[in-house]
Regions:
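Bacterial N-terminal signal peptides that target proteins for export
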Residues: 9-19
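Bacterial N-terminal signal peptides
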Residues: 19-30
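Carbohydrate-active catalytic/glycan-binding domains of CAZyme proteins
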Residues: 31-384
Length: 384
């Protein structure tokens, strides 16, 4: 028996040594003769230049085209995406002549985040109260379209926040509509916040969160005129908890009265137990880019990765998206104003527009996966 055991051990050792020798040879061969990486062509089935489909009667073929300031939520097994009234080569007269059901706030849906169908428009017209406020306080200007919608569910009701403004002014109106369906019809519920040239803030770009830790509701909004603000909402109504409350400052930047800052998007990461505030810097048609801060509470204070408070008069980092171009492609500008969605499995996605260079007039939806690094900061995938 001892001799047999010895022979078995001897064979085992020899086999191990032979295996290690073969492994070493394999390593030497692989190191001495590396295989060159050969990329597999993966042509884009959709043309980035959609000029040929830009006529109003082609609206059912737009898919990811003509998307600006997107907000996305998954409802059941369907993703719904709402976006600003921004259409390349828009012509309301042609739309009317060809019976295009042109309205306000584009609504799309998808099963896979790749193939999108344009459902239509949320509203048949701009709410009269918003039009009256803006034009009365902006010398008859503005209120020609609806910007930056945001969708959130409360019990069995969907709440759609939106803004109406006069471009380049602080005269703006954030309104609320509700529906039993994400596709409408929508019932107007009134004004959340409205501003004019006398107020320090600008009532545009709403983003709303229900704090999962406290049940309180908060809306983040604003732009470069006075910065970004956070105001508490009444969960029962979706409007401000206190009448005529504008909230408190949460973000601005260096040269904040001149350099662009807008488009807050607030989310909660339950794994990190942090609230992330995504914001957009710079002109929307050129160097538009997304940055981010984080906080322990949805109302702030929000700090960047260097520990700077976003409401200080500094420029904050990191930068998550910016204009770029890959070889063989004209590139993208205006890659900002994002919406963010968290899947039940913990995966995160960012949605934003990109403007096709060099004219920067064609607007296409970009969807990227978000990853959080070891230090708890988000980064986004290079693929769209």
């Amino acid at each position: 028996f001892p001799q047999r055991l010895f022979m078995d051990m001897k064979r085992l050792i020899i086999n191990r040594l032979v295996g290690l020798g073969l492994l070493a040879v394999g390593i030497l061969v692989s190191c001495s003769a590396p295989t060159a990486f050969v990329p597999v062509p993966s042509p884009n089935p959709w043309a980035d230049d959609y000029t040929a489909l830009s006529s109003m009667e082609n609206y059912k073929q737009w898919g990811t085209y003509n998307v600006h300031d997107p907000a996305c939520k998954k409802i059941g097994d369907t993703y719904y995406l709402y976006s600003t009234d921004a259409i390349f080569a828009e012509n309301k007269e042609v739309a009317k002549q060809k019976n295009v059901p042109l309205g306000y706030i584009q609504v799309r849906k998808s099963k896979d985040l790749v193939n999108w169908d344009l459902v239509g428009w949320a509203f048949p017209e701009i709410p009269a109260e918003a039009v009256n406020w803006v034009r009365t306080h902006a010398e008859g200007q503005g209120a020609t379209n609806i910007w930056a919608p945001y969708i959130i569910k409360h019990n069995d009701v969907y709440r759609l926040y939106y803004c109406v403004s006069a471009f380049g002014k602080k005269t703006s109106y954030i309104g609320l509509a509700e529906s039993a369906s994400p596709e409408g019809p929508w019932i107007q519920k009134g004004c959340v916040v409205k501003t004019d040239e006398q107020t320090p803030m600008n009532a545009i770009d709403p983003s709303v969160i229900e704090d999962p830790q406290t049940g309180r509701w908060w809306m983040h909004y604003g732009s470069y005129f006075g910065g970004l603000f956070c105001v508490e909402l009444n969960p029962a109504t979706g409007l401000t908890r206190q009448k005529n409350d504008y909230g408190h400052l949460i973000a601005r930047r260096a040269n904040y009265k001149k350099d662009n800052l807008e488009a807050p998007e607030i989310i909660f990461n339950p794994e990190l137990k942090k609230y992330f505030l995504f914001v957009s810097y710079d002109p929307l048609m050129t160097t538009y880019n997304v940055r981010v801060g984080r906080a322990d509470k949805p109302e702030g204070p929000f700090l960047d990765y260097a520990g700077h408070d976003l409401k200080d008069t500094t420029n904050n980092f990191p930068i998550l998206t910016a204009p770029y171009a890959f070889e063989g492609h004209p590139g993208w500008a205006g890659t900002a104003h994002c919406g963010v969605w968290r899947e039940e499995n913990g995966r995160y996605y960012m949605f934003h527009q990109g403007r096709l260079s060099p004219e920067n007039q064609l607007m296409v939806l970009h969807t990227r996966e978000i990853f959080f690094n070891a230090e708890g900061w988000p980064v986004v995938s290079p693929e769209r």
